[in-house]
């Protein structure tokens, strides 16, 4: 366990100083404290051992203070104890980081407004086999980590492809401990909405020995974690506008009593209820060998095995143009801008879906490092790594179609009212006239072979303190296969149905329509049982158009000079990287064939291979300066260029085109695909940070940043003319990715942390962390039809803050943490947005934990997440067009921790 010491005399000195004088007169206070410390004879005083939260914050502050670049860190309080049990939620406490949640858990993050985040494990690549270039943060068990470092600006010795920053996950090594170490945790968690208990456990064993061939250390760590969730959603989408200048729309407006008035109506509304669970199994084995004082070898195998499963019910009513029929005598109500607010529709189609989804991801990282101090001044490091990752996904959907008598909808309140009525009953199979089944399977496999050689030479005197240079080669491969969605129309309504009780839906706070019917959960969860029940012979086959292979090789060299000329130190360097990219896929065309009776059928599908090869070289200079204004006050200035390569999903060249039949001639034809010709995004970065460290765990920092991003990748819709073999041509709206924009991101961060040791008695255990981030961004949004407008970057809140109250004294520690972020754009390319982006409303969440050390080796911890049951909501650009409202679980966990 990491330990720090300070003297009682210094504690007494700090106890006599108020918070106000500390914050205003910090320089003088720091000098006095240093003088007192030097004057105190250590032999006459008993040292106070600092552990737990204080040691964690002190270690993180030390990393930030002494780093060559701008970095923020999280350090585990003890083995298996990050401040938050979810990795993404731990990261959200860092200034400049915003988290995205999926089914109640943090799943991904953005750094300073950008989602192009690089993920590393102990300074090396780590990723999930998927369309992204990074690790899914859901996959990592937090118990395996010693800490997390977030690099916010680059230096030449850091690996490129970090447009927003790099997140480096650090694991423990056997030489981190003085000798034998054993630690274990056992956790039981309750998830209140789904009302389930789930266990978690972790174990670490480590030891080191002197042998005839040198010192050897072995560490083995394993973590097993299960969680459950339920998510309830009320949705309204999409919205369509009726234009009185369009004859067809004008006729509908006449029936609504809205003649000559532009009016917007919802064309779909309903509810969804999702049940699921996650299972994380992580293992880490590390072996270190130090044959001499100048040579050290480290071998490590890290494995993450993640399982995700859900099944859900959804029930929707569709108010299409032909079904916009108000109930007689009950006219619709509208907002002042013409947006629908409430009313009753009659005789409208309904859909009742039951679905299941599974994901299994495995990532295994093999690494070997040699560190050799060749001379007192020269250190050489050689590093090799192999990563193997796989992901398998399955989606299975059973659907019923029918007709409802009425739909009452009121979207004017904070919780929309959805009330669907049927004279035959929504739980009666006779209400439904048809059924269908959809299934899809896809697999991804990725690998990375990396070799790296670094050398650093330190100078004994002069301005130049050291020179560091290195070479790196990486061979990254990614392959995806996909069946596409297979549609199976069912000849009759199956009998394997059950009633779903919705009495406690939305915690009982929703005005709802009662129970529904669904395909049996016990069957839909089992894919083969579902196929057997529905009489489907086998799973769908993988199709050529679902096959995408990509090979990316990078060749890198860098050189960095580190210098020091009091009061300034820093580094200047350049990184040069060549990227060779090979992308392949298939272009699929399916024509329409008309037989002698005039019947239309799909003709034979034609698959045309697509192969694209590209190379480009990037030159990435960087400069980092640190100016020591006083012993405790420093100013950092940084400038750098960086790149972010397109993701594998964005580069996927495969495209599927189906010729429209006669009934679809006048409809808009659309498809989607990637773009293998995308360029990497390039950024020019300027950073500044003013940092005041007034105690071991006390600091006040302010940082400002500016990024200008060229070749910004966005979703865009373009019109493409497609000619089929019969000579017929059609225009298709193709949704893809383009380098269409120059984006700008600027902002600042404020952060403060302190323990109030000067307070008397038990109050001296109080402490606080607080940070605030402001990010302003602009980029053109050409994703939908209509004029191009400037909107904030997707998933970026302009404001977010964290306030954390801390208490630690004796064996008791506690923490209450509140995280808040302002509204943000979810997407600019949503269904039926009317050229308006989808926004997430402002969102805040309260979490807390309390821990007590029963003995020096045994502790109990109580954690609570989402204590206030916060609702999340989205809307279509303006407040009168709500999209959905979501509730998730509150989680309470009790952990027993033992360490020797």
Positions of the model-derived regions?
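Gram-negative outer-membrane beta-barrel transporters
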Residues: 705-709, 718, 724-828, 868
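A beta-strand signature from Gram-negative outer-membrane beta-barrel systems
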Residues: 94, 140-185, 231, 760, ...
């Amino acid at each position: 366990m990491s330990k720090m010491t300070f003297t009682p005399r210094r504690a007494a000195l700090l106890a006599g100083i108020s918070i106000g004088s500390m914050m205003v007169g910090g320089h003088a206070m720091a000098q006095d404290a240093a003088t007192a410390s030097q004057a105190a004879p250590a032999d006459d005083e008993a040292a106070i051992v600092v552990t737990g939260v204080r040691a964690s914050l002190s270690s993180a502050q030390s990393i930030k203070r002494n780093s060559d670049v701008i970095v923020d860190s999280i350090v585990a309080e003890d083995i298996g104890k990050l401040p938050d049990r979810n990795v993404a939620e731990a990261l959200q406490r860092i200034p400049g980081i915003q988290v995205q949640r999926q089914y109640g858990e943090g799943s991904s993050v953005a750094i300073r407004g950008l989602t192009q985040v690089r993920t590393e494990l102990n300074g090396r690549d780590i990723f999930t086999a998927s369309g992204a270039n990074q690790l899914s943060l859901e996959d990592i068990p937090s118990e395996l980590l010693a800490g997390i470092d977030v690099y916010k600006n680059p230096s030449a010795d850091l690996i490129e492809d970090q447009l927003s920053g790099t997140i480096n996950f650090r694991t423990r090594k056997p030489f981190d401990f003085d000798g034998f170490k054993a630690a274990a945790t056992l956790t039981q968690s309750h998830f209140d909405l789904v009302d389930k208990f789930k266990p978690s456990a972790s174990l670490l064993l480590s030891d080191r020995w002197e042998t005839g061939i040198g010192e050897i250390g072995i560490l083995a760590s394993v973590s097993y974690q299960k969680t459950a969730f339920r998510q309830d959603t009320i949705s309204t989408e999409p919205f369509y506008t009726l234009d009185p200048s369009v004859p067809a729309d004008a006729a509908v407006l006449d029936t609504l009593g809205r003649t000559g008035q532009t009016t917007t109506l919802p064309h779909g509304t309903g509810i969804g209820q999702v049940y699921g669970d996650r299972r994380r199994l992580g293992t880490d084995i590390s072996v270190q060998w130090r044959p001499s004082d100048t040579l050290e070898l480290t071998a490590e195998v890290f494995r993450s095995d993640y399982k995700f499963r859900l099944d859900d019910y959804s029930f929707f009513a569709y108010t299409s143009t032909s079904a916009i029929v108000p109930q007689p005598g009950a006219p619709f109500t509208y907002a002042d801008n013409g947006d629908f607010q409430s009313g009753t529709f009659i005789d409208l189609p309904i859909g009742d879906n039951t679905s299941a989804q599974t994901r299994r991801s495995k990532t295994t990282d093999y690494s070997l490092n040699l560190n050799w101090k060749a001379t007192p001044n020269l250190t050489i490091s050689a590093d090799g790594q192999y990563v193997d990752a796989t992901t398998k996904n399955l989606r299975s959907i059973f659907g019923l179609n029918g007709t409802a008598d009425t739909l009452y909808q009121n979207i004017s309140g904070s919780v929309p009212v959805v009330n669907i009525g049927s004279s035959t009953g929504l739980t009666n199979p006779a209400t439904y006239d048809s059924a269908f089944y959809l299934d899809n399977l896809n697999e991804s496999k990725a690998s990375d072979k990396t070799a790296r050689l670094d050398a650093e030479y330190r100078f004994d005197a002069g301005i130049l303190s050291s020179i560091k240079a290195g070479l790196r080669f990486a061979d990254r491969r990614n392959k995806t296969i996909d069946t596409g969605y297979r549609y199976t129309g069912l000849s009759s309504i199956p009998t394997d149905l059950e009633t779903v009780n919705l009495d406690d839906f939305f915690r009982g706070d929703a005005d709802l329509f009662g129970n529904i019917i669904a395909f049996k959960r016990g069957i839909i969860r089992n894919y083969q049982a579902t196929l057997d029940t529905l009489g489907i012979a086998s799973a769908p086959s993988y199709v050529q158009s679902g096959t995408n292979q990509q090979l990316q090789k990078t060749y890198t060299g860098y050189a960095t000079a580190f210098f020091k000329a009091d009061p300034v130190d820093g580094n200047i360097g350049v990184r040069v990287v060549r990227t060779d990219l090979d992308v392949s896929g298939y272009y699929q065309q399916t024509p329409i064939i008309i037989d002698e009776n005039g019947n239309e059928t799909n003709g034979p599908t034609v698959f045309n291979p697509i192969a694209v090869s590209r190379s480009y070289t990037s030159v990435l200079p960087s400069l980092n300066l640190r100016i020591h204004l006083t012993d405790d006050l420093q100013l950092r200035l940084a400038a750098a260029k960086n790149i972010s390569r397109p993701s594998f999903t964005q580069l996927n060249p495969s495209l599927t085109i189906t010729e429209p039949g006669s009934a679809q001639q006048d409809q808009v034809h659309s498809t989607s695909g990637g773009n293998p010709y995308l360029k990497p995004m390039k950024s020019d970065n300027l950073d500044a940070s003013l940092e005041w460290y007034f105690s071991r765990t006390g600091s006040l920092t302010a940082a400002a940043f500016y990024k200008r991003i060229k070749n910004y990748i966005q979703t865009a819709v373009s019109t493409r003319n497609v000619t089929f073999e019969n000579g017929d041509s059609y225009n298709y709206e193709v949704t893809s990715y383009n380098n269409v924009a120059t984006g700008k991101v600027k902002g600042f961060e404020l952060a403060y942390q302190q323990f109030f040791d000067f307070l008397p008695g038990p109050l001296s255990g109080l402490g606080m962390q607080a940070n605030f981030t402001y990010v302003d961004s602009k980029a053109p949004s050409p994703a939908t039809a209509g004029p191009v407008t400037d909107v904030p970057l997707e998933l970026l809140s302009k404001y977010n803050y964290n306030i954390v109250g801390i208490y630690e004294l004796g064996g008791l520690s506690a923490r209450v943490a509140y995280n808040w972020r302002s509204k943000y754009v979810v997407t600019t390319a949503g269904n039926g947005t009317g050229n308006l982006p989808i926004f997430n409303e402002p969102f805040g969440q309260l979490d807390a934990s309390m821990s007590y050390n029963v003995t020096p080796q045994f502790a109990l911890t109580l954690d609570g997440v989402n204590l206030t049951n916060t609702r999340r909501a989205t809307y279509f650009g303006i407040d009168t067009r709500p999209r959905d409202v979501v509730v998730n679980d509150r989680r309470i966990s009790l952990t027993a921790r033992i360490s020797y």
